[in-house]
Amino acid sequence: MDSVKHTTEIIVDLTKMHYHMINDRLSRYDPVVLVLAAFGGTLVYTKVVHLYRKSEDPILKRMGAYVFSLLRKLPAVRDKIEKELAAEKPKLIESIHKDDKDKQFISTLPIAPLSQDSIMELAKKYEDYNTFNIDGGRVSGAVYTDRHAEHINLLGKIYEKYAFSNPLHPDVFPGARKMEAELIRMVLNLYNGPEDSSGSVTSGGTESIIMACFSYRNRAHSLGIEHPVILACKTAHAAFDKAAHLCGMRLRHVPVDSDNRVDLKEMERLIDSNVCMLVGSAPNFPSGTIDPIPEIAKLGKKYGIPVHVDACLGGFMIPFMNDAGYLIPVFDFRNPGVTSISCDTHKYGCTPKGSSIVMYRSKELHHFQYFSVADWCGGIYATPTIAGSRAGANTAVAWATLLSFGRDEYVRRCAQIVKHTRMLAEKIEKIKWIKPYGKSDVSLVAFSGNGVNIYEVSDKMMKLGWNLNTLQNPAAIHICLTINQANEEVVNAFAVDLEKICEELAAKGEQKADSGMAAMYGMAAQVPKSVVDEVIALYIDATYSAPPSTSN
């Protein structure tokens, strides 16, 4: 007791001494100056804290962006940028409408109704704008089924019955409600969901990812975490960036290892008290590589952090790979640490666009996704997803597709796609001007250039009728194989065309690209992100624009 008392007295004496010392030094300043200094210091501190919490980007990068935002307010800089953007706008509009043959545009309601024959004729004309051979396997991803007549016929009949149904009103549309519940449960069972598991139908993979992040944001807030962080590999889908932006979260990116899988040591190092979810991809979109889900799940269990598996791309491939003869690590709810999964039915599930499933290990976690207003004057308002009204027809045709295909058909398609994916990967590895990018674990083959500009390769492949996906950081392209590419004829044709183009470019030597993807990505690498964002905005605007020369 005496030692504690003595220590306390020493602390008190030291405190008094420093108090008088500080007070004596500050006494020479005007009190108003001290108040203003304290106020200014507090303001600077709060601004710095806000800047830190706003983004996971390095401070220097954010400072550079801030400095550029100030510079572009200068008349000379602003005028230069606006002039360049103005010159770019008509080019973008022209590129969007290049396949619009007649340049006619409907901008007002017709006074009298058009006949059904006229409408169908117009729809057929618009359909003919497409110049890529989708069914012939020339398009990477996009359309994941072969669109056979029997399936299309079934979809038409189902849509006819459920075109105006809306699961928001389960009492009015009990059949649509049941279809939605059955669709969710079928997919949950594919992913070995436990008895208490639950989920929702969404409009697509992006909404499924947003919903999962929204749930974990709400869970984090309930635990007192004010500034929740998503911890995801840098190859995770950009929908996580969108979710972080919409939900007021921060996204912390984890680097990859030599195989383009998440670096587990770095992931563990980056975990702190603000991390509210860990993310693994099965597979990721850029290279088609599956992250080590069992190990990520163990990290989640170790630190008590929910783990989300993004299986949007491979959602209707990976559950069937073992049966198809391709063994992969456990990716689903059999991992105790996995708490949620996103899975697109409208990709390899072969359903029409507009359906995806977000799944949760428990109803308790699912409840964090729900939104309700119990005291609204219009009555109690409650929705499970972002949407209020939901297209029951989208759920109905997805439900019908799963039932009409059955497990055996999905296994057959999976085996065919994986077989030809690996066949193509082997052929591409033999092309000396190409370097594989990541591992082709499921249905993607990604590659970069080895002495050739890979974006020029993409441009020239497009001229031969191949529509591929361009990647960046690093520069690469990929082809996503669907059932339409899963045959030797397409695989061989792709490999032959790719090698031929690489030979031509290698013989030509390094030259500056002035058009196409090569020019666009070259520009994007050299100008500030804010300017790139403005060009992107112009491009999106162009997709809603009338053709350059129109008559109503």
From Swiss-Prot:
Tissue expression summary: High expression found in the intestinal cells and faint expression in the head.
Record topological domains on the Cytoplasmic side: 53-552
Function: Cleaves phosphorylated sphingoid bases (PSBs or S1Ps) at the C2-3 carbon bond to yield a fatty aldehyde and phosphoethanolamine. These bioactive sphingolipid metabolites are essential for normal development, intestinal integrity, growth and reproduction.
Deletion consequences: Without spl-1 expression, animals become bloated, pale, congested with eggs and hatched larvae, and demonstrate shrunken gut and gonadal structures.
Pfam families according to UniProt: Pyridoxal_deC
Functional pathway: Lipid metabolism; sphingolipid metabolism
Protein name: Sphingosine-1-phosphate lyase
Transmembrane segments: 32-52
The entry's keywords: Endoplasmic reticulum, Lipid metabolism, Lyase, Membrane, Pyridoxal phosphate, Signal-anchor, Sphingolipid metabolism, Transmembrane, Transmembrane helix
Organism: Caenorhabditis elegans
EC id: 4.1.2.27
Record-stated family: Belongs to the group II decarboxylase family. Sphingosine-1-phosphate lyase subfamily.
PTM-bearing positions, type N6-(pyridoxal phosphate)lysine: K347
Lumenal side: 1-31
Cofactor(s) for this UniProt protein: pyridoxal 5'-phosphate
Reactions listed under catalytic activity: sphinganine 1-phosphate = hexadecanal + phosphoethanolamine; 15-methylhexadecasphing-4-enine 1-phosphate = (2E)-13-methyltetradecenal + phosphoethanolamine; 15-methylhexadecasphinganine 1-phosphate = 13-methyltetradecanal + phosphoethanolamine
Gene giving rise to this polypeptide: spl-1
InterPro entries reported for this sequence: GrpII_AminoAcid_Decarb, PyrdxlP-dep_de-COase, PyrdxlP-dep_Trfase, PyrdxlP-dep_Trfase_major, PyrdxlP-dep_Trfase_small
Gene3D superfamilies in the cross-refs: 6.10.140.2150, Aspartate Aminotransferase, domain 1, Type I PLP-dependent aspartate aminotransferase-like (Major domain)
